[in-house]
Amino acid sequence: MKVGFIGLGAMGRPMARNLHRAGKLTGVWNRTAARARAFADETGCRAFESPADLAAACDFIVTCVSADADLLAVVDALLPRLRQSCIVIDCSTVAADTARDAARRLAAAGGSLLDCPVSGGVEGAKNATLAIMCGGDVDVFERAQPVLAALGRTNVRMGPSGAGQATKATNQILCAGAIQVAAEAMAFAQAEGLPLDSVVAILGQGAGASWYFVHRAPFMARGKYPAGFRVRLHDKDLRICRDMAARHGAVLPVVETTLADYARLLATGHGEEDISTIFRLKTPLFAGGGG
């Protein structure tokens, strides 16, 4: 089994590292070549000069890129030297229609796509505990199991091509609600004069806890928002959710509220911070109260 990896960002780098630890990684490619060379120096794998070179050497290719156009550009770059029956496992978050488009392009060249977006944050990527939601043919999903097992704790086939991305869109709506609630609750606790570290410690064990409260409320307590899930990326994802909902004639209030908040954060230079920086917008809600 020869596996290549494309996209060594905050999520991709630790995911590729886990494939290396599992003894499956042949090599990597990254748009910023220096990042690929540094990873190759660290792990001893190969840094390919182009996606086509990687495609010629690998039976499985994992991709993790930032945007729909990036994914389609990578897929097109793979096609000239794609091995027959190669499986591309795309862990990016893109529109379901984009996943289906990529699947059609690969199928025409004799390959297959699994759309396999992930959830679990940078922590999950580092610890290989990601939840992986998959769309594609059953036989392709079964063949990809050794690769998926090296990347995450759980993987489930949700349906045909695009179903993984539709599931991820659902997840991103959940994330919007969770971070909104966590930020408003923490702002309320702060206004009440409660010790925020203690709030996290006790309520993180309660019925109202969520992954975002447990793992991101501490960022709010410290007022530090190191990049985990960047505002600009969740903003991109929620725009996908908005478009998908619009096809059903629906407007989702939590999506619209969060996009409005993100517009303010992006305009004030916080787009590269973790989405927990939304706490900045919640504390002023309590500024008009009495002492």
Regions from the language model: what does each represent?
Residues M1-T63, C86, V122:
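NAD(P)+-binding Rossmann beta1-loop-alpha1 motif at the extreme N-terminus of oxidoreductases
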Residues T93-I173:
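Rossmann-fold dinucleotide-binding core
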